């Protein structure tokens, strides 16, 4: 063994420690930032039209991703021409998952929305993949436990809404939108995951092409408030730009870095902490008046973590691990 090889082996432990440290820092930043952004939308952006909010936020993110693709000389046009079917499917599912997510955050607490959204994804992927992979007791037990707590969480929030009759309709809409958003995100994982592996799509190719339909639809629906966003004296346009960074751009970068350094299995156990962190932020900003719903939010987080731990020890990747590998974002 020559001197260079010996030096490389000596440096290996430090490199591993450094990579692990970076990975843990990035996944921690991802969870904190995603939770903060969700609470921010729920608390501060309820008066702006949901379509306008979605369009302006994703437009900033889209421009950022296109700039990165240009600098890296990614051939986006060729990717679109070669994968028309994949592009159409991913755009339709992205429209529902992202637009409904923003609408849900305007109608229900961020912790509840995040728990419903993240909790329904593993079950959707499990059902969709049942024919190809089968459903064993080990694969089904975790999602079944999550479904139980999701049902109890929805029922608890319904009951609380009943005590606040003026908000009942809004809360019901928020819960329904969060569940639909999470379910379509799960469908996105199932429909596009194999195609991305087969065709070797890069992260930037996916990110620069999946939001096009969403931008067209929300741009059309929310165009009447664009002037309000630009002329707002409270700096609404700047707030939306910062929101785009905190809810889309930076989380994607942090998540991908953590997956690269820690592996998808470890990361998939950390991401369900987002609703719990959102819950903690809500207690600081606007404390809950009762304890049942917050406890159920935490139980949903715990059940998803348990589900992912069980599935990550099986021979095949679990649904949320698959989501992290293929989608590049829990959103």
Show where each model-derived region lies.
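Membrane-interface helix termini and inter-helical loops of multi-pass transporters
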Residues: 39-50, 106, 155-170, 223-240, ...
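Loop-to-transmembrane-helix transition segments
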Residues: 22-30, 76-101, 173-181, 231-250, ...
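Specific transmembrane alpha-helical segments of multi-pass solute transporters/efflux pumps
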Residues: 36-37, 73-117, 151, 244-262
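Structural signature of hydrophobic alpha-helical transmembrane segments
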Residues: 49-63, 103-120, 171-184, 234-246, ...
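Glycine-/small-residue-enriched transmembrane alpha-helix faces in small-molecule transporters
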Residues: 1-55, 100, 147-151, 161-194, ...
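Hydrophobic transmembrane alpha-helices of multi-pass small-molecule transport proteins
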Residues: 65, 136-160, 272-273, 279-281, ...
């Amino acid at each position: 063994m020559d001197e260079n090889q010996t030096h490389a082996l000596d440096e290996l432990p430090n490199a591993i420690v450094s990579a692990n440290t970076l990975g843990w820092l990035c996944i921690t930043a991802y969870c904190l930032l995603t939770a903060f952004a969700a609470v921010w939308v729920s608390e501060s952006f309820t008066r702006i039209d949901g379509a306008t909010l979605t369009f302006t936020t994703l437009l900033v993110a889209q421009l950022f991703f296109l700039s990165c693709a240009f600098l890296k000389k990614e051939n986006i046009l060729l990717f679109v021409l070669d994968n028309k079917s994949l592009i159409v499917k991913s755009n339709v599912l992205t429209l529902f998952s992202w637009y409904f997510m923003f609408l849900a955050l305007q109608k229900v607490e961020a912790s509840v929305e995040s728990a419903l959204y993240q909790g329904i994804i593993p079950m959707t992927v499990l059902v969709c993949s049942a024919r190809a992979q089968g459903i064993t007791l080990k694969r089904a037990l975790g999602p079944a436990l999550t479904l139980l707590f999701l049902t109890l969480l929805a029922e608890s929030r319904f009951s609380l809404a009943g005590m606040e009759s003026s908000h009942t309709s809004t809360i019901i809409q928020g819960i329904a939108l969060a569940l639909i958003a999470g379910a379509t995100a799960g469908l996105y994982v199932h429909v596009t995951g194999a195609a991305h592996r087969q065709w070797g799509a890069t992260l930037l190719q996916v990110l620069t092409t999946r939001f096009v339909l969403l931008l067209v639809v929300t741009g059309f629906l929310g165009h009447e408030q664009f002037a309000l966003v630009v002329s707002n004296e409270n700096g609404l346009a700047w707030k939306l730009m910062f929101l785009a960074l905190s809810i889309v751009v930076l989380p994607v970068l942090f998540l991908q870095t953590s997956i690269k350094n820690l592996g998808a299995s470890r990361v998939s156990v950390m991401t369900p902490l987002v609703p719990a962190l959102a819950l903690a932020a809500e207690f600081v900003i606007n404390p809950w008046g009762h304890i049942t719903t917050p406890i159920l939010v935490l139980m949903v987080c715990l059940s998803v973590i348990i589900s992912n731990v069980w599935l990550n020890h099986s021979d095949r990747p679990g649904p949320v691990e698959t989501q992290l590998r293929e989608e590049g974002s829990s959103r």
